Amino acid sequence: MTSSCRTSKHSGTTTVQLPALDTDRKTSRALVKRRVQVLIVGLGPAGTACGMELAKSGLDVLAIDRAHFPRDKICGDALTGDALRFLRENNIPSKIIQRSFGETRKPCYAELTHTLAEASGYSLQGTALRQKTASFQSIRRIDLDNWLVESCAKAGLPMEFGWQMQSLHRLSASDPWCVAGTIRSRKRKVQERFEVTAEVVVGCDGVSSVVQNLTREQHAPRPIALASRRYSRRDEVENPDVSLMDYQWPRNPSYAWRFSVTGGTNAGIYWCHHRDIPPLSGRDLLALTRLHAPRGDAIRTWGIPVLTEDLLPQSPSGILLTGDAASLVDPMIGHGIDRAIHSGELAGQILSKGFQTGCTVEQITRTYENNLDCRRVEWQRSFKGMDNMLGGIDRTAEQFAISLLRSVMLPSTTQP
């Protein structure tokens, strides 16, 4: 099979399209019933990472998604090292990953000198530090998620598309979960209904997780950060080969971004959720986005349930939450896709080992949550860093200058 190109109807932006899967079901009037050991709800990075693990486990698994692929997903599209490692281990085609020159702009960088910047491999562009090598990497989510689903299909993972979960219940704590919903065609027409009985349901269904909302008795308020996204063609922007993070607002970790992607750029605003940052209205978010990216496709916005130091309520037995559904995102330092992958992979590994070694569903659930909580503690450090910055403890430019001086002085001080 060969890949082809598709063009956005809004801007003409070219993206790579992998072979589309035949995800439409044949029309049927009967209720579709299934019984499995594990049901994965959502086939983004978390659900597909979980599915890849379980496809080789021998367990009876089904993965569903309300969409038909390929489909777009609002995202900044940036890839961290951990995400890249997973993708390369699974042989992602290099042509759908974009490389560019990373650039960070902060008002405090006015204190730096060209000599200090050059000493650490950067060039100083006004108040911005730009990498000298094209090491910033990104991928459009429509390409990433379609490739991940294609990989799951090749691995033999049973999947259904157009299946939208609407209810989830069980008779008692010792009974399996029953998930029900509607099946829609690519044109969004309801064709039939489904009912799946599963011992474990893995919630990989993102920001507005239905699995999370229907199973957690305590609905503690989750901090929501705001973000926007606008795709533009290469001829609509300056420096399309530079991926910029622009911290425009003093004593505020919010930032504007413009990341290079195949065929153009992904630009947007991340507005911080922190208690000491004034809230931003949706109208103001759109206005800031237009100012930052005057030309391009329609602007899309979303809320991000972000990682904080607050503990999340325990899930009931047989419910494993991953990625955005578990509030693991840290937009401050770009961690979204990688944490979705990590938590999905972790869920798959623990489910595979747990069922194969005769663990109970309760034991599997708590083992997953305990393992994820250990990682969560490590990931929460950036929240403390935000507190330090807003409290005036952090001196970014000063610390950067000191580290650069140390890197310059170190060779001479270590000579015999």
Where are these regions (language model features)?
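A conserved beta-strand/loop capping segment in the N-terminal third of enzymes
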Residues: 84-146
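Conserved Rossmann-like nucleotide-cofactor binding loop
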Residues: 46, 69, 208
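Beta1/beta-strand and adjacent pyrophosphate-binding region of the FAD-binding site
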Residues: 29-46
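FAD/FMN-dependent oxidoreductases across multiple families
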Residues: 166-167, 273-350, 356-359
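Conserved N-terminal glycine-rich FAD pyrophosphate-binding loop of Rossmann-like flavoproteins
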Residues: 68-88
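Predominantly flavin-linked oxidoreductase catalytic cores and closely associated redox partners
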Residues: 151-295, 311
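C-terminal helical "tail/cap" subdomain of flavin- and related membrane-associated enzymes
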Residues: 349-416
